């Protein structure tokens, strides 16, 4: 494997292009279960390179069932608590420092342990526009009702294929 073709062609580097997100910034999303999501780096802000999100679970059970993506890989890094990660074959009780990489097509799922808070990082590559998907799911958790067709369209548009 080799390095990709250069995307920056300058000679002296750039000043002012880095982006900082402070830990105390408010989350972009909150749902009734107490789960919050912080958009650390979106596909738009990384020019499509990746999307990185901090997912803080509240004590109520939360997380998607088994699914896969055709166009993006997804990785999980547990920061605190216990997160149940499904690797397509079994559920794994992941603890701080545990990491799971799921390539395109890999079946996976995640959920917190009921009654316990937990936190993890979600990394998508390339940086697909996952924000609309997350926002719609949080709207549904907050009472929005989707028709079956709207739900099906949402999943197809955002490369979410349930198994």
Name what the model sees in each region.
Residues 1-41:
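Long, hydrophobic/aromatic N-terminal blocks
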Residues 26-66, 72-73:
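A short glycine-rich, His/Asp/Glu-containing loop-to-beta-strand
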Residues 46-48, 84, 104-131:
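Ligand-binding loop in jelly-roll beta-barrel domains
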Residues 54-58, 68-87, 123-125:
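Short, conserved beta-strand element in jelly-roll/cupin
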Residues 58-61, 97, 105, 115:
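Tight coil/turn sites that cap or link beta-strands
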Residues 62, 69, 83, 109, ...:
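Hydrophobic small-molecule pocket/channel-lining residues, especially in calycin-type beta-barrels
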Residues 89-107:
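Short acidic-glycine-tyrosine-enriched beta hairpin
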Residues 133-163:
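Acidic/histidine-enriched, glycine/proline-rich intrinsically disordered or flexible terminal extensions
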